[in-house]
Amino acid sequence: MVSVQVNENESIDKLLKRFKKKYERAGVLKEFRKKAYFVKPSIEKRLKRSRSKRRAQRANEERNS
């Protein structure tokens, strides 16, 4: 569970910003979306490969630019 201590004289905006950062880094939302529905292992592997391929293509394009 993500928790944030309130510092003295800290605005709500700063507190909220720190909370959002911790929340994102903890991967709570990512994990929730991942477990929202079942994905077959074969499809999961296929998606992982395609994401990896796209990432490699982008990196290659950036190096060539």
UniProtKB/Swiss-Prot annotation:
Query: What's a single GO MF annotation on this record?
Result: structural constituent of ribosome
Q: Which domain of life is it from?
A: Bacteria
Identify one Gene Ontology CC term for this UniProt entry: ribosome
Q: What GO terms describe the biological role, i.e. biological process, of this protein?
A: translation
Write out the entry's keywords from A to Z: Ribonucleoprotein, Ribosomal protein
User: Which InterPro entries does this chain map to?
Assistant: Ribosomal_bS21, Ribosomal_bS21_sf
Family to which this protein belongs: Belongs to the bacterial ribosomal protein bS21 family.
Question: What is the protein named?
Answer: Small ribosomal subunit protein bS21
What's the source species for this entry? Chlorobaculum tepidum (strain ATCC 49652 / DSM 12025 / NBRC 103806 / TLS)
Lineage of source species: Bacteria, Pseudomonadati, Chlorobiota, Chlorobiia, Chlorobiales
